[in-house]
Amino acid sequence: MSPTELIREIEKRRTFAIISHPDAGKTTLTEKLLLFGGAIQLAGTVKSRKASRHATSDWMELEKQRGISVTSSVMQFPYKDRIINLLDTPGHADFSEDTYRTLTAVDSALMVIDSAKGVEERTIKLMEVCRLRNTPILTFINKLDREGQEPIELLDEIERVLGIRCAPLTWPIGMGKRFKGIFHLSHNRIHLFSPTHGGKIKTGEQIQGLDNPRLSELLGNQVEELQEEIALVQGASHPFDKEAFLAGEQTPVFFGSAMNNFGVEELLDAYVEYAPSPRARETATRRVAPKELKFSGFVFKIQANMDPQHRDRIAFLRVCSGSYQKGMKLRHTRLGREVQIANVLTFMAGEREQAETAWPGDIIGFHNHGTIQIGDTFTQGEELQFTGIPHFAPELFRRVRLKDPLRTKALLKGLQQLSEEGATQLFRPLLGNDLILGAVGVLQFDVVAHRLKHEYSVDCGYDSVQVVTARWVSCNDSRRLEEFRTKAAAHLALDGAGNLTYLAPTRVNLDLTMERWPEVAFHAIREHALGVEDGNPLVASL
């Protein structure tokens, strides 16, 4: 691999995720991007779910049943001399942690907004995450073929609620029953709306210029209204500023109808033109540039049983620098171990292929036999640890109840493997034999029970447990920590990675315990793999 070849491959890559509130049309837009990219021939539209076609990115059985995305899928496809890596994030609020980690693996994000509902709660939370990292954001305002809010009101709401300047690059001509198409402001071109569903790509007539006589023929009285509106928009809105976009301060805005394949091509064309290629990444010791010749990357997700026939676990790794070549040896820095990585996968939703090479920005999958954790770094020898991949304290807890005591071993294996994915956390109290599951949303418990039954043949239920929150515990004084461990044993547990955790029965109890033990640190967040928060090492099982 020459430096020139590496730079050429880096410049080709665009890695992004789609963020939205549930039902804004994220999964449909994902399908249509794949359709325009030539990655699929038939879009599994939402309406056709009952006819046994499901969205390509919703590959897990439970997702197909419920019609929601609960895991992050990875899809790669070529488009206009670029390689697009699209990470589909969970649409359900209960899976925010998985989405948060996915957003650490991308270089930009596409925000989808329902034109009728405007900025919704989940979008606000996801944008906060993007703002922390100054992630460049493109915006697609969807469902223009239905009645919705006025476009100017939507832009105002985005600016006011999300705190990001809007630069419209396309503008709708009417909406709902009066929706006639979009005007491309920078190209001075009208693209007329022609509704198409599923796998058909119909371009619709394109007309150059607002004063074109053909426009009057087609739109009649709507032309003057459109001319006035466009003049107002051009005078009042922010012009597109690429530097402000790359700094996460301004978002280019596009309008369309994903269900009808309309406005998607303009969005995709602008995305490959404006979105950044892979960017430098922070580690605990230094910044790693993608053009460095030596390979490095980090694991942001683990998925169990992507292939139910093989009971496998796949670790998803974002390549940060250099290139992966089949069969190369890599250093697993957390374990200080050299490993030969022979069978690496690339993804198209549930479909997988063997990867011969991979470049910065690409997402590849390693087979994980229980040694890889979320946040782990792999390099060609250097002791690096990529940072910024958090683990949050869960907010809901349940005691796991096994219906068949003979399946105890299978239950433990299933819970350990599923908790490695990071959507739920398993806690084993120091006293007794309970297994306590922690999550940030109720749906996660349903998902675990469903997957235990279908993937591990384990039937389980849940009991309530007197735990309101968890805190990871650390202390620089090992003698004092051992004393705390003895005296607070009734409320202590080990998490899936062996870290000591305080399971607080009430908020008052937590406050009193923290007052009573000032030398002990209680952490609501810990970094994956590092086991460090605010400079304090989190203690593994002692």
Swiss-Prot record:
Record has Hydrolase as a keyword: no
Entry GO terms, CC: cytosol
Record keywords: Cytoplasm, GTP-binding, Nucleotide-binding, Protein biosynthesis
Cellular compartments annotated: Cytoplasm
Residue numbers binding GTP: 20-27, 88-92, 142-145
Superkingdom classification of source: Bacteria
Pfam families hit by this protein: EF-G_D2, GTP_EFTU, RF3_C
Residue ranges annotated for the tr-type G domain, each copy included: 11-279
GO MF, one annotated term: GTP binding
GO biological-process terms attached to the record: regulation of translational termination
PROSITE patterns: G_TR_1 (PS00301), G_TR_2 (PS51722)
InterPro entries linked: EF-G-like_DII (IPR053905), EFG_III/V (IPR035647), G_TR_CS (IPR031157), P-loop_NTPase (IPR027417), PrfC (IPR004548), RF3_C (IPR032090), RF3_dom_3_sf (IPR038467), RF3_GTP-bd (IPR041732)
Role of this protein: Increases the formation of ribosomal termination complexes and stimulates activities of RF-1 and RF-2. It binds guanine nucleotides and has strong preference for UGA stop codons. It may interact directly with the ribosome. The stimulation of RF-1 and RF-2 is significantly reduced by GTP and GDP, but not by GMP.
HAMAP family per the UniProt record, alphabetical: Rel_fac_3
Record family assignment: Belongs to the TRAFAC class translation factor GTPase superfamily. Classic translation factor GTPase family. PrfC subfamily.
Name of protein: Peptide chain release factor 3
Gene it is expressed from: prfC
